Structure formats: structure tokens, C-alpha cells
Amino acid sequence: MKKNILIIGYGNIASRLHAILCKDSYKIYGISRSKKRGLKNFIKWDWLSKDLPNIQCNNFDSIIFIPKPTNSHQAGYQEGFLKSSENTFNFLEASKKIFYKKFITISSTGAYGLTTRHESYLDESSNIVPMFTEENPYPGDEVDLGQYIIRKYEQNQMRRYRNKLIILRLSGLYTSKPISKNHLHRATAAKIIKFFIENDFDFSSPEIFNCTEDASLFVGEKKSSYGNISNEKIKKLGFIFD
């Protein structure tokens, strides 16, 4: 029997993932605002609206959530990460008959802020900023707004999905040529998601994984530098970077 996969935010990475998943093993459902080429089981939904999507299937092996800022400003990040994830959780809660084993949420190594501030390697345990609570709701001045929103988004997802949650922090995505010192090809991003779909690790708590290529020399327009975000955790789990 095929396993059902729901992708919320079906775009470029999702289409790459769809292309490499075994068609005999998985049935893909994709949610986006507009119909996508090659996607048979399409569900139209604007995740910023209060309307609920109409989903006929109610049993999924994995749900993949791929957020995207609506623009590069504060409001765009708040809508793309915070509002969209809140509305997604609300619709899953409203649809109490929807079952899923894993919730894979895509995040960003932007959670570390400007990595040029850090001299050493950053890993998932790095104490980059204080955890935000009701008593400590806002970061200090040294934390950029994008970092704050991404960290807030991750914390919200942990609270919502608990041990079903896998957070994948993708570094600077590229298609043909890296443009940032910490980078990840879009095809590799799809392979990483596939890896977590195909393997059941039965984590007892939410898990975060940095998804970035090995820290090889990156040559930019003005200077050369090495990536400083560690990918050791995901490699120890068994993922192999090409």
C-alpha cells in the first residue's frame, strides 16, 4: 500500500522531491495557491486566509511544511513563517480526523543570524540567542529581526508538534552556483527531505538538523571564506552529501 505524503507549500523544492520519490511507494498531495505542473493531487489553499483547505485524504505518513516569506521585509517574514504556520496548525487541529506520523518543517540557518558574527562552527546546540518566553518575549538589539522571527517560528512548531517534529535548517539555497558561504543545492535539499520521509527514527523529542554542504572554500565577489555551520549531526544519522 502506498504511503500518503502531504506537502504544504508546493514549489520548486517540493517538485524536486516529488520527482525522486518512488511512485510505487508514495502518493503525493500538494497544497499551494496555484496549480503546479505535474501535480495530480492538487489542493488549492492560501495559507494566509482563514478558509480551510478541502483535503479528502486523512491519513499521512509525513507532512512537509515549506514556508516562504511573502517579501524581504518584516511583514513578509511574519506572514511567511509565523502566520502561515499558525494557520496550518489551526486547520490540522480543526480537521481532527487527519493522522500523520511525522511533521517535517523547513526552517533556515538564518536562525543563527549573521554568521559573520561567529568565529567558531555553529551546530544545533549552539546557544545563539536566548529562548523566547512570555517573560522574555523580545531579543536584544544584537539579534536581527529575521533571526528572531525564524527562532520564534521554530519554537512555535516545537510546541505544536512535539516528538513528531523534525526541523530542517536549510542554508543558502542555490541552483547552479553558491552565493553564500553556507550553502545547499536545491536538489540536495530535496534529497534530505526524502531521507527523513523514507527513514523512521522514532525521535522522542523535536529534532533540529542543519542542512548545509561541507564547509569547503567559497569564493565570493569580494573575499573567500569557509562555511561555519556544522552538518555533522545529519551525517551521523546517515545522510551522505554528494
Where are these regions (language model features)?
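Conserved N-terminal Rossmann-fold NAD(P)-binding element of oxidoreductases
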Residues: 5-9
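SDR active-site strand-loop-helix element
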Residues: 31, 66, 103-109, 168-170
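NAD(P)H-binding glycine-rich loop region in Rossmannoid oxidoreductase-like domains
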Residues: 37, 41-87
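Active-site Tyr-X1-5-Lys
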Residues: 129-165
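Mid/C-terminal beta-alpha module of Rossmann-like enzyme folds, strongest
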Residues: 189-232, 236-239
